[in-house]
Amino acid sequence: MKHIALLTTLLLSASLQAVEKPYDYVFFENSLMKGDYFYSQAKYTSPSWIKNARHHLPVAGSVAFTPGNSLELTYVSAPGGDWYSEIQYCPVRGNDFFREPSTLSMQVRLRESMNAAALPNIAIRYADSTYTQYLNLRNYLKDTRPGVWHPVSIPLEDFGLNAVNDTNIKKLAAVALRPGTADGNEYTIYLDDIELLPASLPSVSALNAPVLQEAKAYERHIDIKWIPQSKEDIKYYRIYRSFDGITYQPVAVRRPWMNRYTDFLGEVGKKAYYKVTAVDYALNESNDSQTVSATTYPMTDEQLLDMVQEANFRYYWEGAEPNSGLARENIPGRNDMIATGASGFGIMAIVAGIERGFITREEGVQRFLKITSFLEKADKFHGAVSHFIDGTTGKTVAFFGPKDNGGDLVETSFLFQGLLTARQYFNQENDKEKQIRKSIDNLWKNVEWSWYKQFKDSPYLYWHWSPDQAWVINHKLIGWNETMITYMLAIMGPKYGISPEMYYSGWASQEEYAQEYRADWGRVEDGKMYTNGNTYYGENLKVGVSNGGPLFFIHYSYLGLDPHKFTDKYTNYFENNQKMAKINQRYCIENQGGYVGYGEDCWGLTASDFAWNYQAQEPMPHRDNGTMAPTGALASFPYTPDASMKALRNYYRNHGSFLWGEYGFRDAFNLTVNWVSPLFMGLNQAPVTVMIENYRTNLLWNLFMSHPDVQKGIQKIQSIK
């Protein structure tokens, strides 16, 4: 027997010491994808058998305790054979604070009457592939009537587990199932709501019925929204839908941090009616809300662009950390932590949202007063901000570990690309907008870009500086990648700027160290000099490592910096970026890896969430595993408008049932392995809104490029012969 206490991590990062409202450790609630469930495993040895698809458990779409689906476990346990199945914990980036559990809880439903002894045995698998002891499920399922959901609660101490808490809970990797009595018969059971719960859960004497605010229809989906209630009392909201206004069926749940539901109907001209209830941890349900309804309708390309821009904008407006008004790293994820680079992108998305009428200018002004006030008080490191900040305190969060506890110059540059854009937008002569400009000017002039050279004669800028460990990370900034804007803003800095020559000595360096750096991460010699000159898929690429890299390289630095208007010794960057986008699409059309879905309307390899971690995909076989992020093609609209529009239509009309959500398209998907990310990412939602707006009106480009310091900096670089 193995005890979880033995797995306690001794050294905790500073981020785990923060105070944040805890949440539940959930192995399964619902699958976004039909077919097989990615975070599961199923295998057998004949004559036993377990139903599976590609060694995963099937998703049961028509049977569910928590709508809309459950997992199907159909098996034969025969003498001389064996089977095994597990339901894995799906890691959510930033979910690190959990209610201390005491039980493994689930809902179980038998399809038919069965021999209770043939129920599976159950254990918990550790991350190191060892197991707790197996228990007989029949000892905890007291009621075996078929066709009814039965709650099952197994004390963790029965598995030999004790002292489970935030320091070790992620060592619990999966719920494992093996045969009980081998009687040779076929049985089916359904499993739902598999989670670890504490002994004492929040409850209330009476739940208030939610108050619905709107139902808004689009081409193939309807959004409903309600007034949020106290999150402490509610486990989830349950959404009911009717097509006749009389008979309602539960179709989904939403955890209390989300007060919206996107119902993807997949049809045009479909009317639906909705009600919502609140459900507490004892599964008590409130009265119904009032009814709202809407009807889907055909949309033009321009209307689809509006729809996508607004949904992605919503991430930064409704999904923002409330005290700072800035962007979270991802949703779901760490509630109190803001990501500074994503916030800079979101600032530009909010400006676009004002111009598009998603919010009023006055609403935008109030948000920016909050943002600038927060940033003025937040931790700074020679004027630079950290990558992650606690939105409730303004203190640095060392989310990537104890070395990441100081200034992050790249994230600072992403933030200030947005702030300078906003500074130019809020140009009215009233007290509030004057205050916004004054605050941004003060923040801007106090960034000590030159400090991040590390030493006086350094040809490079450095990514990080720690107040107690100095240059411990010691990462030089060398292009080609996402950091062009860092060098550009450092040259533009009004008080602590760097020499414009550092554009060539640092960013575009041709020193041996820089050559080795590029060849190492690109795993090719192409582009190691910064310049390239090779032709890929019919496009001659003047600058770039390998055949261009992930597409965020042509997005992040150019949300405000207009690549049409920047030409250095080697290339014009609109033309060069456009070639990279075309190379990426043509690689996906050719599809050497044979990945499901790739083509002229499914392309755009870039950095995104993946099943177990964050990865950067690019158009090279060794950097491509079939994972596609919608932001890749959609943030490339200025470069490839026709190809990007094809991708938008495809993602929405053909894959919207799992890919489209409350904040636009989910971060990534992989049709080859039937996986979709549960996340919306702060770094990936805004570039879609911003670059579509730049394609349509040049708005953000015009604003950023109008700043006097930006104009001076570009002139300095372009004057170098």
UniProtKB/Swiss-Prot annotation:
Optimum pH is 6.0. Coiled coil: none annotated. It is found in: Periplasm. GO terms for cellular component: periplasmic space. Its EC number is 3.2.1.214. GO terms for molecular function: hydrolase activity, acting on glycosyl bonds. Its main location: periplasm. InterPro entries: Glycoamylase-like_cons_dom, Ig-like_fold. This is Exo beta-1,2-glucooligosaccharide sophorohydrolase (non-reducing end). It comes from Parabacteroides distasonis (strain ATCC 8503 / DSM 20701 / CIP 104284 / JCM 5825 / NCTC 11152).
